[in-house]
């Protein structure tokens, strides 16, 4: 046969009769044939003299089980796997504790299966070696099970269960002759089937010789017997009790225990009394069945009595002094009852065996943890040399080394704790922070968590560490976005209750934290602490890009966004980004065709009416827009703090302690507010002086040409972040500052202030040389620049004609235009016309001369 040829095999299944060897193509035909052998299939070990055999018994060819109908046999055959069925892969072998059968040497991994298997050997021995004798009236069946037929009584069975009201009702049986008795060897009860009279079914109860506990089935009895022994003792002792049968009494008459003839067994102990099972109404004076339990052994220490010497010995161990160790493992317990409770874990099904020492464990995790003890080096080793088998204890030990200074030991720690004494007031005072604690435990906890800098709670998301677990749980809400605490006034939600309480102060207006230097109040203690840095010039937060210092961390964070040009809040419609979320929400109103809600005092826009109501405008003040005026120069400011700062910065030479605001807050000198007097910071390039370091740093960018704030839209850079903020409104088209008189809007507040002076006619900026006044400071600065140029020209008369520098014209328009507003013209009364003027320094595009206002000085 070549390799290319295919071989087809036809397999035909046939069923062979186990009695005569005939073959049949189907199981149904084989079952019908076996009906002829039904009489021959009757097993003599189950046949009792005088009892007719059952008809139509069908035996399973796999396990030999007898069934009554073919349908039952077919249903039973489905439980056996066929040969063509794919075998499941075997589980990997693991260390298990097996139970060995002493008869056939079979191994079982479950105690229940082992007990059930041992019971099968007991049945075979009972049937093969014992005599089967039937008694119809007064005789006894000597097969290991007693058969009793009571007189005609109600069909009830009374069990000795401890509950006198517990009983089981069974239907009465008829249609069977009085001599036909069926004994069911697979159960612990017998069936009396009599004809013409009712017969009660009585259960055979099994009594433990050690603890006098009762059981209904041999399996439960044998399993319980195994709990009184361990190891080989359990198996050997169980063998001695397998063939013993419980003792029953018929009509109150005690019987001797019946032992199977074929087995060599030991008798029950003398104190093992018989169980009395009687029908109801048989003995009126007895309300319930009792079992004689006479304590014969007493303890000499506590006079407690016991039924067996084993119980007495176990009890006497409890009077000994601990510790007690487990005989199966190395665990130690302070009392013996705890050892007994621990031994129950070893009696359970421990299937995980240690190959090194032979100890068994319930779970694989416990076994792996135990096997670390057999390693040469333990798994968890600390830097100080200590080793741990348990990870939890190792982590707890590492807390000792978490502080900056190493721990010197438990002895020194106890000395430190003992040396702490309460103050005369009864409190424990903390020197670093000044807090008082009523209890020593609270004081030590404060020292450990606050001043030891021990942060052992780590966030799994960002890796940040916290001192307390509650702080970590609050921090985790920032990653999930959950805000479970909401304000009942404005419906704002917060991720912690502390933030909610701080927010409520904005509704009540309460500011409990007040600065002692300037009188300014704050709602949070941290804000007051940061404010005090201003007085002491303590700017702790420095920008690494430009070197500007800030006294608040969030100011530095907002400042750093200007360097990168990437703002955190981006519009999804047009792609513009914003520094604040409020600005983004106001911008998105324009996409929806809605108008923002604007504050009339300061011109700030808000996305909702509620946000506008929550806004407390500093320009409005408590007096409806009234400002505080400086008594020295007349400048108006919005608050006491601004007035004190202004006086200290601008008028440090005039030390006026009587300058006060409407609230009577005294103005402190400059040296008390900021630790120094006047403008003591000088620029090394131009020798200009400044009052703050921030102002000096911003000024020095003029000399260095540094522009650290680029525009993310066009790339243009600026020296200050405020200039960038104003510039970005050109891209967005936003003009939040609107004139109340004419309705004209501007991008910055300065332009609006200059525009309002047109309506009022106010010219606050005057020239000190000629006395001319201007509406804006920029126009005054440009005007004074001309005076400086005139002085230069007077020093060099030959460079310019003398008659060309006598008059100056200032061009002013209603709207600001990008032109140079100063020109030089000929004196008045000259014959030269306006058209002959030479505009050398004036750049005008698409502007007629009629729109230019020409004036003379």
From Swiss-Prot:
<feature type="zinc finger region" description="C2H2-type 13">
    <location>
        <begin position="541"/>
        <end position="563"/>
    </location>
</feature>
<feature type="zinc finger region" description="C2H2-type 15; degenerate">
    <location>
        <begin position="597"/>
        <end position="619"/>
    </location>
</feature>
<dbReference type="InterPro" id="IPR036236">
    <property type="entry name" value="Znf_C2H2_sf"/>
</dbReference>
<feature type="zinc finger region" description="C2H2-type 8">
    <location>
        <begin position="380"/>
        <end position="401"/>
    </location>
</feature>
<feature type="zinc finger region" description="C2H2-type 7">
    <location>
        <begin position="352"/>
        <end position="374"/>
    </location>
</feature>
<dbReference type="GO" id="GO:0005634">
    <property type="term" value="C:nucleus"/>
</dbReference>
<feature type="zinc finger region" description="C2H2-type 16">
    <location>
        <begin position="628"/>
        <end position="651"/>
    </location>
</feature>
<feature type="zinc finger region" description="C2H2-type 2">
    <location>
        <begin position="58"/>
        <end position="80"/>
    </location>
</feature>
<feature type="zinc finger region" description="C2H2-type 3">
    <location>
        <begin position="99"/>
        <end position="121"/>
    </location>
</feature>
<keyword id="KW-0539">Nucleus</keyword>
<feature type="zinc finger region" description="C2H2-type 17">
    <location>
        <begin position="681"/>
        <end position="703"/>
    </location>
</feature>
<comment type="similarity">
    <text>Belongs to the krueppel C2H2-type zinc-finger protein family.</text>
</comment>
<feature type="zinc finger region" description="C2H2-type 11">
    <location>
        <begin position="485"/>
        <end position="507"/>
    </location>
</feature>
<feature type="region of interest" description="Disordered">
    <location>
        <begin position="648"/>
        <end position="678"/>
    </location>
</feature>
<keyword id="KW-0238">DNA-binding</keyword>
<dbReference type="Pfam" id="PF00096">
    <property type="entry name" value="zf-C2H2"/>
</dbReference>
<keyword id="KW-0677">Repeat</keyword>
<comment type="function">
    <text>May be involved in transcriptional regulation.</text>
</comment>
<keyword id="KW-0804">Transcription</keyword>
<feature type="zinc finger region" description="C2H2-type 5">
    <location>
        <begin position="297"/>
        <end position="319"/>
    </location>
</feature>
<feature type="zinc finger region" description="C2H2-type 18">
    <location>
        <begin position="709"/>
        <end position="731"/>
    </location>
</feature>
<feature type="zinc finger region" description="C2H2-type 1">
    <location>
        <begin position="15"/>
        <end position="37"/>
    </location>
</feature>
<keyword id="KW-0479">Metal-binding</keyword>
<feature type="zinc finger region" description="C2H2-type 12">
    <location>
        <begin position="513"/>
        <end position="535"/>
    </location>
</feature>
<feature type="zinc finger region" description="C2H2-type 6">
    <location>
        <begin position="324"/>
        <end position="346"/>
    </location>
</feature>
<dbReference type="GO" id="GO:0008270">
    <property type="term" value="F:zinc ion binding"/>
</dbReference>
<dbReference type="GO" id="GO:0003677">
    <property type="term" value="F:DNA binding"/>
</dbReference>
<feature type="zinc finger region" description="C2H2-type 14">
    <location>
        <begin position="569"/>
        <end position="591"/>
    </location>
</feature>
<keyword id="KW-0863">Zinc-finger</keyword>
<keyword id="KW-0862">Zinc</keyword>
<dbReference type="Pfam" id="PF13912">
    <property type="entry name" value="zf-C2H2_6"/>
</dbReference>
<feature type="zinc finger region" description="C2H2-type 9">
    <location>
        <begin position="428"/>
        <end position="451"/>
    </location>
</feature>
<feature type="zinc finger region" description="C2H2-type 20">
    <location>
        <begin position="765"/>
        <end position="787"/>
    </location>
</feature>
<feature type="zinc finger region" description="C2H2-type 10">
    <location>
        <begin position="457"/>
        <end position="479"/>
    </location>
</feature>
<dbReference type="InterPro" id="IPR013087">
    <property type="entry name" value="Znf_C2H2_type"/>
</dbReference>
<dbReference type="Pfam" id="PF12874">
    <property type="entry name" value="zf-met"/>
</dbReference>
<feature type="compositionally biased region" description="Polar residues">
    <location>
        <begin position="651"/>
        <end position="663"/>
    </location>
</feature>
<keyword id="KW-0805">Transcription regulation</keyword>
<feature type="zinc finger region" description="C2H2-type 19">
    <location>
        <begin position="737"/>
        <end position="759"/>
    </location>
</feature>
<protein>
    <recommendedName>
        <fullName>Zinc finger protein 574</fullName>
    </recommendedName>
</protein>
<feature type="zinc finger region" description="C2H2-type 4">
    <location>
        <begin position="206"/>
        <end position="228"/>
    </location>
</feature>
